[in-house]
Amino acid sequence: MIIKEYRIPLPMTVDEYRIAQLYMIQKKSRNETHGQGSGVEILENRPYTDGPGGSGQYTHKVYHVGMHIPGWFRSILPKAALRVVEESWNAYPYTRTRFTCPFVEKFSIDIETFYKTDTGENNNVFNLSPVEKSQLITDIIDIVKDPVPPSEYKTEEDPKLFQSVKTCRGPLSENWIQEYKKRLLPIMCAYKLCKVEFRYWGMQSKIERFIHDTGLRRVMVRAHRQAWCWQDEWYGLTMEKIRELEREVQLMLSRKMAQFSEEGPSELSKDSATKDQASGTTSDPGSKNGEPLGRGLKKQWSTSSKSSRSSKRGASPSRHSISEWRMQSIARDSDEGSEEEFFDAHENLYCTEEKQAKDMTKWNSNDLMDKMESPEPEESQDEIYQQSGSEFRVASSVEQLNIIEDEVSQPLAAPPSKIHVLLLVLHGGTILDTGAGDPSSKQGDTNTITNVFDTVMRVHYPSALGHLAIRLVPCPPICADAFALVSNLSPYGHDEGCLSSSQDHIPLAALPLLATSSPQYQEAVATVIQRANLAYGDFIKSQEGVTFNGQVCLIGDCVGGILAFDALCYSGQPVSESQSSSRRGSVVSMQDADLLSPGTLANAAHCSGGSGGGGSGGSSLESSRHLSRSNIDIPRSNGTEDSRRQLPRKRSDSSTYELDTIQQHQAFLSSLHASVLRNEPSSRRSSSSTMLDGAGALGKFDFEIADLFLFGCPLGLVLALRKTVIPSLDVFQLRPACQQVYNLFHPADPSASRLEPLLERRFHSLPPFSIPRYQRYPLGDGCSTLLADVLQTHNTVFQEHAAPSSPGTAPAGRGFRRASEISIASQVSGMAESYTASSIAQKGPSSLNHTPSIRRLSLLALPPPSPTTQGPRARARQVSPNLERAPCLPDLDIGEVAAKWWGQKRIDYALYCPDALTAFPTVALPHLFHASYWESTDVVSFLLRQVMRHDSSSILELDGKEVSVFTPSQPRERWQRKRTHVKLRNVAANHRINDAVANEDGPQVVTGRFMYGPLDMVTLTGEKVDVHIMTQPPSGEWLHLDTLVTNSSGRVSYTIPETHRLGVGVYPIKMVVRGDHTFADSYITVLPRGTEFVVFSIDGSFAASVSIMGSDPKVRAGAVDVVRHWQDLGYLIIYVTGRPDMQKQRVVAWLAQHNFPHGVVSFCDGLVHDPLRHKANFLKLLISELHLRAHAAYGSTKDVAVYNSISLSPMHIYIVGRPTKKLQQQCQFITDGYAAHLAQLKYNHRARPARNTATRMALRKGSFGLPGQSDFLRSRNHLLRTISAQPSGPSHRHDRTQTQMDSEQRGQRSMSVAASCWGRAMAGRLEPGAATGPK
């Protein structure tokens, strides 16, 4: 539901407005009623008492809107649904209006209006609660300034030009509001609270936005301009005269509508009468309403669509009943299981009602009005989804650029960008778009998916908030001409009244094929590349992107996906030739074809040029000639000619072909895949090749693309045509310049097609990967999308179809894309997946020269091969131990599939859609499915899992083992207590588990507390918590130990049973709340007796500043190096603090931010009076009960007494701060900083290695992860730009030690650092696959 408050100031009194409004309504009803499909019927108009607002006038109308609804939408609605029922209660200065629609139960428009004598500055006219006010979007309408579509503009209705004859008012200036206030002239404001709801699958956001912007705002702007400019007609009228006019109009409309439908009015009147009889007292609703102004208006005041349907039950099936069933089916689907909290879609997506309205209604409807440039015919059938064919204009100004330039004049001082992932939405619309519709529809879809991203991240991916940016790249409507052409070929095209039959007959699959065969397709791809570079450049110049060094991903919809693919194919060509070479971008290996007949072009047996997908684009013009020998003057290009020179336009005969256009088109199509065909063994070089370098002007992307996401794209059909036209071309050779392609589609979408069978035919036997429902698995279901896992899981399929032929190899002509280690990681969701998948394609070092499809960036992630000669099976076992468990495929088949693949994961992904959609008219499905992608939480959560990592343990060990993927053992369930759902509506999780230390022969106990809110405002009481532990970290399996129930204080305590007793080591622990999948992370450290440890007081020894106003303190220079030194010596690191455990997430995030080594962290149990006593008791517990030994301690002067209490030698107590005589003999003061102290420890032999060898083996070297920071994967080119901007020289390192800088550089050079395997993740929403990132 979208809720907006419109404020409309007018230069008149409230009483005058009442007359003007009533007169305007009756006049417009009279003038705009044309009959069937467009008109108004007034069924009832009577006074009422004691109703909404007290006493007033009740009106019951029916609007026939069939001619104003898009054709595809009209085809799925029952005939009765083409009427909108209006019920209004007018009690000035308050009115209420409700619109409903028969047979469309989940649709309603509710408008509440107050009329005040002000200029619209009252911010709480409707007495909304704070929660309701936070949901509200305010939109001020100015009848003078707000633009009007050219098709609706009339000079006599322009307030800037109109002057009344009767009142002498007007014209109005643009500052009329200020002028009227200053001169104390009459002025009033209409406050309209509008709530629009259309709860149907796939259409909700788009339809609700369309109703607000076109059905409400646009209508209100025009109507209020008319109310002012028609004042000479209504000024001086009385209410009696208005009522008389209304009766005349009611009689006239009933007669006019009866001419077109003898059944419609009477039938609806019958339904209305039935409603009145059934409801009894509904004609006087205010009698039961305690609110005098009618704020409690409910649905029983509206015409009951259920009673309307009841009169038709039992009748034989008809188109009417089928259409009714269609809408009911998708409505039921949207509310499936709504009685259960967990399965309620709205409650699941939005934690609170406040978030629901706030997040989904951020789009400003002024964008629509500002972009209306061209007249729109009223008879336009697809107004909602039509796209504008006008040029895209960049919304930037000189002033903004000047500000940006001033801010980035010193790039070295610029803070790092918070944006880690940039999503460019290539929006081209559907294949049925005519290209002449609403220009803001593209931006509206982009805003919709942006809001869904924000909502999903806020609920389940909080660490990603603020780190993802989305920008629109509008694409030309390339299918518009093809759609217009094919529409004229329909056998029903002559019958305008048979819209459904004529459009259903359109062969949808032919539209993208025709579009990509058009000579204008080259310009479309060039335009997309240019606009994408422009959008990226504007983002880089903006404040949030000036230091951007993250990854860029493309999202292509039905049409935009085709353009994105071809743009990536061209961008991926190696630039080996010079810019001026005539061979650059051309295909030099071709075959001449035999001559056929005059005027006919013959395809070569192995013609070149990756066709854009059309019949005319399939052949190269150089591969064919006209029979006419007079065509000898077709120019030939050679190595010395300028590739940019245009062909002479001379003809020696009347050829029917525009050779210039066709040759440029052919050159473009060929250049798309020139690197593939250049090395075709079947092709021979021809010095007489004449391919223009027409694609040279296309340009390339100015940035590296990580992933390409396709939404319902018919790319498979286009590539299948290219394969048909060029039989020698293997589709897998058309490799786009990105690391992974994701083809998302709904199985019932007629526009979509699969890609995997084109790359490997045996995949036709496998279903596409099913994306889990967000409502049930908000963080994924843990199923692997890796190609390696698919090949092993379905090994029988590939073995049965295995052919004895040698594995295919990708052409060597395509150069490698050099990538950084960060780019390696971004290939797949998680580091471990890149290891597994890339290892499959590895055939040995020698194969690199022959199989460029096996990317070097994949091999860089692998450990160097053993110098000893090993068979392929042995190598496979080394790099992927998991493959040993399943029967292995022959390496021949594995290598063949991996060499063909566009990435290292599955490519085809199927989304859920209601089964009832298969019964919908075909013409309606492209629009419906296209709208569903932008508001789909399934799509958004899947995208998030691909582009980001959540768990710090997603980094690999030095030995190259895979990090285990965590998957929730149980799906979400309903809360055990009904009150829990209400208590947690507006609070975030703040769960924590105490770091546990145990002996291998003693009790191993883990305790946790589950709270919500930053100050533990809400306790999770009586709810289920699942306990998981990783048995053999980091590559072991997550084991579900037990399910606990929290007590009244939100605590749980679990003792690991003897059957699962842990040996010496550090084990990650997760406790997951069953009701909402929030979780807490911690570790249990099992140690042998006699283990030595070094203790650090966090605030006393690390903090260099005091935390004021909630800001994080600075870290003392060199502190991290000292802690790491003791860790390298084999000591257990203990961190103690007097802070309450409710701050655990914040403190651990601070430790992770500064790369402190991993250790056990001890917090106070809530707010305590004596935190020093807590520190002492914790250390005494370690020594007395666990038999550990303290070797050294660091802290402030306050900590001296704590360390003395555990009998620690003064020589091993190190205090940071000014020396005092009182403590001179009790400790060692660090006066020259940690750098000097570290030098003393190293070179004066004051620190010896730990004595317990078993402990040193168990305590692996590692650091805290980065909780609270979504560690997005970075692309190579942005890293290079960032590195080049880093300050150089030792003078810039005064705040950071040498070791810190080196560690970060090592982290950039190799992501296989053991440290983060033991990273600690901030308690947040659980991400299945957290260990290696998303699946």
Swiss-Prot record:
Annotated disulfide bonds: none
Span of domain DDHD: 701-949
Compositional bias (Low complexity): 299-319
Tissue: Detected in retina and in the dentate gyrus of the cerebellum.
Omega-N-methylarginine carried by residues: 814
Lipid bilayer topology: Peripheral membrane protein
Primary localization class, coarse: membrane
Described purpose of this protein according to its UniProt entry: Catalyzes the transfer of phosphatidylinositol and phosphatidylcholine between membranes (in vitro). Binds calcium ions.
Protein name: Membrane-associated phosphatidylinositol transfer protein 2
Organism: Mus musculus (Mouse)
Lineage, uppermost ranks: Eukaryota, Metazoa, Chordata, Craniata, Vertebrata
